[in-house]
């Protein structure tokens, strides 16, 4: 799976769970904040995290859950899509994150970093884009086959405050954007800190 993102300090602690692995063969999709990815077999999809993502659907070609909706269920072709993620404009423009992975057989990944399920005859799925919290698509993984399900996307921590409140005291080299409708936006894609 991808890496969790954690925001803590001043008595506040928030964890954004990363996207899950894809399901493989008869194994269920792995759990993740963006919901489980598309299962490659009849077992259940991965579990989403309350307030962050929906569950993946059950069934061989089912999609994984996204941040805004559950995955689409199906035990036959065509493979089902992963649930879409949620759009946020905290950075000044709309960006969708935490999409669910598509079901095996080429099911499309949900909007927001979910990757497609593996096409028939292709047992591997791609890693999710970094800092999206998306979930990887499902694979078939029949008996005796070696399969590789992609990693879920790592998360991101974004802070927004009035320009007049920004102290400039940061570590970890976050991206800093000022003048975003009168606000300063800090984007952390790795370890770092901000002191007001």
Kindly label every feature range from the protein language model.
Residues 1-196:
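Low-complexity, glycine/proline-biased repetitive segments and flexible coils/loops
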């Amino acid at each position: 799976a991808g890496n969790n993102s954690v925001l803590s300090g001043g008595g506040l602690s928030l964890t954004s769970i990363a996207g899950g692995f894809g399901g493989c063969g008869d194994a269920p999709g792995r759990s993740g904040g963006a919901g489980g990815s598309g299962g490659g077999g009849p077992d259940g999809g991965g579990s989403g995290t309350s307030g962050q993502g929906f569950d993946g659907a059950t069934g061989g070609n089912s999609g994984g859950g996204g941040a805004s909706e559950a995955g689409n269920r199906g035990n036959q072709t065509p493979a089902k899509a992963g649930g879409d993620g949620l759009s946020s404009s905290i950075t000044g423009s709309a960006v969708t994150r935490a999409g669910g992975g598509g079901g095996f057989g080429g099911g499309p990944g949900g909007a927001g970093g979910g990757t497609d399920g593996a096409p028939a005859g292709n047992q591997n799925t791609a890693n999710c884009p970094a800092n999206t919290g998306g979930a990887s698509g499902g694979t078939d993984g029949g008996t005796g086959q070696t399969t590789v399900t992609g990693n879920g996307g790592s998360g991101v921590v974004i802070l927004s405050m009035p320009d007049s409140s920004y102290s400039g005291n940061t570590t970890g080299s976050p991206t800093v954007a000022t003048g975003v409708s009168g606000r300063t936006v800090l984007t952390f894609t790795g370890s770092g800190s901000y002191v007001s």
